[in-house]
Amino acid sequence: MTYPQNVGIKAMEIYVPPQCLDQTLFEKHQGVSAGKYTIGLGLQYMNFCTDREDVCSLALTAVSSLLRKFDIDPKSIGRLEVGTESPIDKAKSVKSVLTTLFEPHGNTSLEGIDTIHACYGGTSALFNAVNWVESRSWDGRDAIVVASDIALYKEDASRPTGGAGCVAMLIGPNAVLSLEPSLRGVYMTNTFDFYKPDMKVEFPIVNGHESIACYLGALDECHKDLLRRTEAAKKQLNGDAPKTGKKVLDLFDYMAFHTPNCKLVSKSYGRLKYNDCLNSTNAADWEGIPDELRNLSYKDSLKDKTLERALVAATKTEFKMRVEPCIAAPSLCGNMYTASLYCSLISLISNIDLASAEGKTIGLFSYGSGAASTLFGMRVTGDLTNMVQKIDLMRRLKQRNIQTPEDYEKACALRLKAYGNKSYKPLGDVSSLTPGTYYLKSIDEAYRRTYAIKGQ
């Protein structure tokens, strides 16, 4: 077997629920100032689910659609791995439910299970799949990686940053989006910025301000680690590797970020600029950033609003060209936890000039509270046009049903009633589901879930 080349994403599909909440209406409903969510967080709409959809139904819909749209033979898949932080069972994996899409075709030889670590699980599953294809264990088949989640909060202040969705990715050689193994920075640590210790409820415990600082701090450390790795690689190759310099932003043409909210993405890009400036000996790199902000202590720099605003302003033009396409869809969808970064990636490729995209490098930042993070690179190694056309994300988002805050609150109440329950018949309306969507039909007395498919 020849060594596989250009291993990465060969195809992608995304599924979002058919209903969404207008954040402008939600601002009025919650009695906050106009623009707090739409401008302050950069969020226009938010996907949400009733009790008819769960992490498994979202995944079933996305994977079945991926197989259908891209004419993938279920027998051609040798690994199936799920990243999620919304499990409905402490032992039985979401992946086990997805085997129902493959077993009827005679395929029960499917490696991989679920990977759980907050919003980072999808990225870990992606790396596992790529490593499998590049390993001696590879049997020549492709892999599918699934990132599926529902983000729901108890506190009113956090609810605007909810959302729901699933991204499924076909992984293999000769991909159109290939991972760049030389472009990776990793940071892992122990934090309590966001966690879910109460198994009786769907809600997390969140320290919002600490979580933002943890996110930005992780980005800083990934920046450092990526530079350390690229410099080490150059030394190992006796200087034969292309020079990367000391600026991480010079390594990428575009960027996509894990997106709890869109405002955090603009702060993050500015933060990368700040780290590049700290590593630079060229005074011109600090242009637009006042002198008094250049020597802040590290702790102060994470929370200094004047520095934050200066960095966002200094990178505004670059951000618009290199990053803004990645938040077009997240601003209309909200947070999808593990699927968030990959929704951003789909948004990016759906909103750039594909004619000139081949050969470009995309930087991606993945963060999961607790905390796990990686800043890594992908290269466009093929024509993305077919994939973007088949995903058709931006058009599909316009077809959702915009519902009222009262409808959203009712849906939340249904989910609260259903969570952890048995002998339960879901009450949510299925009429708005599109044909081919999987939904929860019932939960029996032994907690076993039955799913149905919306017909024509």
Curated annotation (Swiss-Prot):
Tell me which domain of life the UniProt entry assigns to the organism this sequence originates from: Eukaryota
Q: What is an annotated GO biological process for this record, any one?
A: farnesyl diphosphate biosynthetic process, mevalonate pathway
Q: Which InterPro entries match?
A: HMG_CoA_synt_C_dom, HMG_CoA_synth_N, HMG_CoA_synthase_euk, Thiolase-like
Q: What is this protein called?
A: Hydroxymethylglutaryl coenzyme A synthase
Which Pfam family, giving just one, matches this sequence?
Answer: HMG_CoA_synt_N
Reactions performed catalytically: acetoacetyl-CoA + acetyl-CoA + H2O = (3S)-3-hydroxy-3-methylglutaryl-CoA + CoA + H(+)
What family is it from?
A: Belongs to the thiolase-like superfamily. HMG-CoA synthase family.
A GO MF annotation of the entry reads: hydroxymethylglutaryl-CoA synthase activity
Knockout-associated phenotype: Does not affect the ability to produce 1233A and 1233B but leads to increased sensitivity to 1233A.
Which of this chain's residues are annotated to bind (3S)-3-hydroxy-3-methylglutaryl-CoA? A34, C119, T161, S211, H258, K267, N335, S369
Q: List, from the UniProt record, the residues annotated as the active site of this protein.
A: E85, C119, H258
Organism of origin: Fusarium sp
What's the stated role of this polypeptide? HMG-CoA synthase; part of the gene cluster that mediates the biosynthesis of 1233A, a natural compound known as an inhibitor of HMG-CoA synthase in the mevalonate pathway and with antibacterial and antifungal activities. This enzyme condenses acetyl-CoA with acetoacetyl-CoA to form HMG-CoA, which is the substrate for HMG-CoA reductase. As part of the 1233A biosynthesis cluster, is involved in conferring self-resistance to 1233A.
Keywords in alphabetical order, please.
Answer: Lipid biosynthesis, Lipid metabolism, Steroid biosynthesis, Steroid metabolism, Sterol biosynthesis, Sterol metabolism, Transferase
Q: Cross-referenced PANTHER family, in alphabetical order? A: 3-HYDROXY-3-METHYLGLUTARYL COENZYME A SYNTHASE, HYDROXYMETHYLGLUTARYL-COA SYNTHASE
| Induction section of the entry | Expression is increased upon exposure to hygromycin B.
What EC number(s) does the entry state?
Answer: 2.3.3.10
